A protein has these predicted regions:
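Start-transfer (signal-anchor) and selected internal transmembrane alpha helices
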Residues: 1-47, 57, 152, 292-307
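Transmembrane helix-loop junctions in multipass membrane proteins, especially transporters and channels
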Residues: 46-50, 111, 115, 147, ...
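Active-site lumenal/periplasmic loops and adjacent helix-entry segments of GT-C-fold
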Residues: 44-145, 150-157, 161-182
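C-terminal TM-helix exit segments that contain a strictly Trp-centered aromatic cap at the helix terminus
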Residues: 98-102, 252-260, 308
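Membrane-embedded helix bundles of polyisoprenyl
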Residues: 34-38, 126-141, 150-194, 198-232, ...
Length: 308
C-alpha cells in the first residue's frame, strides 16, 4: 500500500479485529452519536428555527437564492436582483452545488408541508445531513487509523469542535459545513490502497471544495504540496500525485461548466475563474508529462513541479 497515511494504518493481522472490531460496524457507532447530538442541537435552537431567525445573513440569502431558483430563475443566473435593484442586481459568487440539497429537500416536502413548511424542513434537515456526512467521514477514517475504543471520542471531539458545530446548527444552510465535509473526503482519499482511485478522490474533493468557495485554495495547496514532497521522497507515491492533479484539473473544468457556464468568464470574488482552471490544467499536464517521460526519476518530477 502506498499512501501518505501508511504509518497510521493498522496492520492487517489478527490483532486488528481485537483492536478495532469489524470495519463494517463503524456506521452503527456513528448513527446514535449523530442522532443524540443533532437532537440536542434541535432542542437548543428550536425557538430560533421555529421563528425563522437565522444565525447568519448568508444563510438567509442562500435560502432566497434557492427560492429564486425554484421560482424559475436560470441555473446560470446567479444575480440577486433584490440587492441594488436599480443597478440590475448583484452577481453572487455562490455555487449551485450548495443549492442542490436545499432545493431537493424543499421540492420533496412541498407536496406534504407546503412551500413554507418545506423551507422549514430544509433548514432543519440540510444541516443535520451535513453533520451526518462529516461524522460518517470521521468514522470511516477513524476506524482505519484509530483503536476502536478511541473512535467515539474522535467523533465527539470533531462534532463538538467550535469551528464545526457553529456551521451545522439547525438553520445553517450556507456552504461552510460542506467545506468541512469535502476536506474530510480529500483526507479519506489518502487511505485508499489504490493510488489512482485515492488520488482521483482527493483531487475531485479539492475541486468541489474550491468550486463551492475559493477559501479552500490555501489548504488545497498545502495538501498538494505535502503530496508532492512525499512523492519526491517515495517513487511509489508518484501515480497518486499524478491522479490527484489530473482529477483536480478535470473536475474543476467540469464543475465550472456545470455550475457557471462559459457565458461569464470574468473573475468574481471567492470563485474559481478561467485563469485558475488554466493553472490547474497546466500543473496537471506538467506533472503527468514528467511522470510519463521518466516515471522513477526524482529529478524529472522536480522539474515537472517547477514547471507547474
Amino acid at each position: 500500500m502506498t499512501t501518505l497515511a501508511a504509518p497510521l494504518v493498522p496492520s492487517r493481522d489478527s490483532d486488528q479485529n481485537a483492536q478495532m472490531g469489524p470495519k463494517h460496524n463503524w456506521l452503527a457507532l456513528v448513527l446514535p452519536i449523530w442522532a443524540g447530538l443533532y437532537g440536542l442541537l434541535i432542542a437548543l435552537n428550536f425557538e430560533r428555527w421555529s421563528q425563522l431567525r437565522f444565525h447568519d445573513p448568508d444563510d438567509q440569502l442562500r435560502l432566497q437564492q434557492v427560492r429564486d431558483l425554484l421560482a424559475g430563475q436560470g441555473w446560470f443566473d446567479l444575480h440577486q436582483y433584490r440587492i441594488d435593484e436599480a443597478g440590475g442586481g448583484v452577481l453572487m459568487h455562490w455555487s449551485r452545488l450548495v443549492d442542490l440539497p436545499i432545493a431537493g429537500v424543499m421540492l420533496a416536502f412541498r407536496p406534504l408541508l407546503g412551500v413554507q413548511g418545506a423551507e422549514m424542513a430544509a433548514l432543519l434537515l440540510v444541516p443535520g445531513l451535513t453533520l451526518l456526512a462529516i461524522m460518517a467521514l470521521v468514522g470511516w477514517i477513524g476506524v482505519r487509523v484509530l483503536p476502536r475504543a478511541a473512535l467515539p471520542m474522535a467523533l465527539l471531539v470533531v462534532a463538538l469542535a467550535v469551528p464545526v458545530i457553529v456551521q451545522i446548527q439547525p438553520g445553517r444552510i450556507d456552504h461552510h459545513g460542506w467545506q468541512i465535509a469535502l476536506a474530510l473526503v480529500a483526507m479519506a482519499g489518502f487511505l485508499f490502497e489504490d493510488d489512482r482511485r485515492g488520488g482521483w478522490l482527493t483531487g475531485a474533493a479539492l475541486a468541489c471544495w474550491m468550486a463551492i468557495s475559493f477559501e479552500g485554495l490555501p489548504l488545497s495547496a498545502w495538501i498538494i504540496a505535502a503530496l508532492a514532497l512525499a512523492a519526491l521522497a517515495d517513487a511509489r507515491l508518484r501515480p497518486r500525485l499524478v491522479a490527484t492533479m489530473q482529477a483536480l484539473a478535470l473536475a474543476s473544468v467540469a464543475l465550472f461548466a456545470a455550475t457557471r457556464g462559459f457565458g461569464d468568464l470574468a473573475n468574481h470574488c471567492d470563485a474559481i475563474a478561467p485563469v485558475h482552471l488554466a493553472a490547474f490544467l497546466w500543473g496537471a499536464a506538467a506533472i503527468t508529462a514528467a511522470h510519463l517521460v521518466r516515471p522513477g526519476s526524482r529529478t524529472t518530477l522536480l522539474a515537472g513541479l517547477g514547471v507547474a
